[in-house]
């Protein structure tokens, strides 16, 4: 399928330069390397827990206001992904790299201005919405670049950028400890945000180059198919616009089949119930550590979470390929195992099983399950619906985290403000256990959803969707009722 006119315009000069000086094999390695480096730097939003103490004590934000900012971040990260995925499939990932350049630097510049001038938290929420969208665009560019360049190794081509993205929070937590980013013993958010503004501007430009290699690869394959192996790599640019929009109708027909597949919605609902609590934990990790184990360092818990998230992303990607290739074991069983691990993690938090010096166990389990979810879900989707519409398919699934993380985050903020107290020096017991006890219901529904997605006929899947939606409505009602009762007491 030919390059679209937009993709041709964005990559024409870069393709000419790269094809003149590099072989196809070298270009693939270059693109993959740049993509992985981009992922290593892309996870600044995962450091939100390190911003929380400053927002609370210096800007005097409540936990509910902080969760509004976190919700805007999640909405910016996940809600535009269906559109970003569609644009990437039709016009190449290079378009997403351009979007990341346009959103990242202005977003962090606005955030730095808000912090410096003590503007309303709504401006900070808007800035993090832009940052969230830019993060997804940059990360999705790298993910699609690797997946489309090396489509045969599904697990590794997805787990490698996903692993680097998880590792980025570990690197970031160490970088933010530098003395130049500290002020009076606390993190200087103004300097931090300005640093990110400059970093992501140049990183987006490099990602633009790496994404252009995908266009080169597809253009070369197209010409070989049409004209044979002896067709030169460089041709008249005016010829590139002929029949350059046939990708859109072909993509549309495949995407319609994806939308009509009942398994799409079963898996989508499962994702909503799994990523929501995980994203809520990351957003509120700083406050959660303070409430449950005040003596622990937030940066250390973020680092532990990042390490085990990275190990999960790397190991599960390779393990899924190994099990499918050698033992024909479905990736869905690995996914179900990670969901069960998340179930026990919620139990441990709710019952304060590991507190004080043992809280690192909670961070490790949470990080491993979080990384596993973001590795296995896209791998399963890639395996079922293929690389042609992977951008649109995975992007459509990201509606679920946008809804789930916002819902669970708001609930946590309400419970924390009413039960824990934002400015309390210490707390007794686990004042947020209510949130995690209620989340056990969502994970239980999620396990049944994945199980029925692997087995069962079409009628069972349809009935399961209806039942699960009714349970989810009941679940939201119970949360609202319990919050109301806790405020009265």
UniProtKB/Swiss-Prot annotation:
Predominant location category? membrane
Keywords per UniProt:
Membrane, Transmembrane, Transmembrane helix, Transport, Vacuole
Q: Tell whether Nucleotide-binding is among the UniProt keywords.
A: no
Q: Does the keyword Transport apply?
A: yes
Provide any one GO MF term from the record: transmembrane transporter activity
Its membrane topology = Multi-pass membrane protein
Q: Which Gene3D superfamilies match?
A: MFS general substrate transporter like domains
Q: Offer a single GO CC term for the protein.
A: fungal-type vacuole membrane
Where in or outside the cell is it found?
A: Vacuole membrane
Q: Which SUPFAM superfamilies match?
A: MFS general substrate transporter
Pfam families linked to this entry: MFS_1
Q: Where are the transmembrane segments?
A: 34-54, 68-88, 94-114, 124-144, 156-175, 196-216, 262-282, 302-324, 335-355, 359-379, 403-423, 463-483
Matching InterPro entries = MFS (IPR011701), MFS_trans_sf (IPR036259)
The text of the family note is:
Belongs to the major facilitator superfamily.
- Described purpose of this protein according to its UniProt entry: Probable transporter.
Identification of the protein by name: Probable transporter MCH1
* Species name: Wickerhamomyces anomalus (Yeast)
Kindly list the organism's lineage. Answer: Eukaryota, Fungi, Dikarya, Ascomycota, Saccharomycotina
């Amino acid at each position: 399928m030919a390059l679209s006119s937009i993709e041709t315009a964005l990559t024409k000069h870069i393709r000419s330069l790269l094809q003149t000086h590099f072989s196809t094999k070298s270009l693939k390695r270059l693109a993959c390397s740049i993509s992985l480096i981009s992922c290593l730097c892309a996870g600044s939003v995962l450091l939100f827990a390190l911003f929380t103490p400053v927002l609370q004590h210096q800007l005097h934000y409540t936990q509910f206001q902080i969760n509004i900012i976190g919700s805007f971040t999640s909405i910016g990260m996940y809600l535009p992904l269906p559109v970003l995925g569609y644009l990437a499939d039709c016009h190449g990932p290079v378009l997403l790299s351009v979007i990341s350049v346009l959103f990242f630097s202005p977003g962090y510049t606005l955030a730095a201005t808000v912090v410096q001038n003590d503007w309303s938290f709504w401006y900070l929420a808007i800035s993090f919405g832009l940052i969230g969208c830019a993060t997804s665009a940059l990360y999705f560019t790298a993910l699609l670049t690797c997946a489309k360049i090396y489509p045969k190794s599904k697990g590794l081509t997805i787990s490698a950028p996903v692993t680097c993205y998880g590792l980025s929070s570990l690197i970031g937590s160490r970088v933010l400890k530098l003395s130049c980013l500290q002020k009076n013993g606390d993190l200087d958010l103004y300097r931090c945000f300005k640093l990110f503004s400059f970093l992501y501007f140049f990183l987006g430009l490099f990602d633009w180059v790496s994404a252009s290699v995908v266009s080169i690869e597809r253009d070369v394959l197209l010409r070989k198919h049409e004209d044979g192996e002896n067709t030169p790599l460089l041709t008249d640019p005016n010829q590139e616009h002929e029949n350059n929009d046939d990708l859109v109708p072909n993509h549309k027909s495949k995407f319609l089949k994806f939308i009509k597949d009942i398994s799409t919605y079963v898996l989508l609902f499962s994702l909503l119930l799994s990523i929501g609590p995980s994203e809520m934990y990351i957003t509120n990790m700083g406050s959660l550590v303070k409430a449950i184990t005040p003596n622990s360092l937030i940066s250390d818990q973020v680092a532990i979470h990042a390490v085990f998230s990275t190990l999960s992303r790397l190991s599960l990607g390779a393990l899924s390929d190994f099990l499918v290739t050698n033992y024909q074991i479905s990736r869905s069983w690995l996914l179900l195992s990670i969901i069960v691990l998340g179930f026990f993690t919620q139990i441990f938090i709710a019952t304060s099983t590991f507190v004080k010096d043992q809280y690192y166990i909670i961070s490790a389990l949470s990080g491993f399950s979080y990384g596993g979810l973001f590795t296995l879900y896209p791998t399963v989707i890639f395996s079922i619906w293929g690389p042609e519409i992977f951008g649109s398919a995975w992007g459509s699934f990201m509606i679920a985290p946008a809804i789930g993380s916002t819902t669970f985050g708001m609930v946590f903020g309400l419970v924390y403000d009413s039960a824990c107290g934002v400015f309390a020096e210490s707390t007794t017991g686990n004042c947020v256990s209510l949130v995690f006890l209620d989340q056990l219901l969502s994970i239980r529904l999620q396990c049944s959803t994945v199980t029925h997605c692997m087995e069962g006929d079409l009628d069972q899947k349809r009935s399961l969707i209806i039942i699960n939606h009714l349970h989810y409505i009941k679940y939201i009602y119970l949360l609202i009722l319990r919050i109301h009762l806790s405020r009265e007491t």
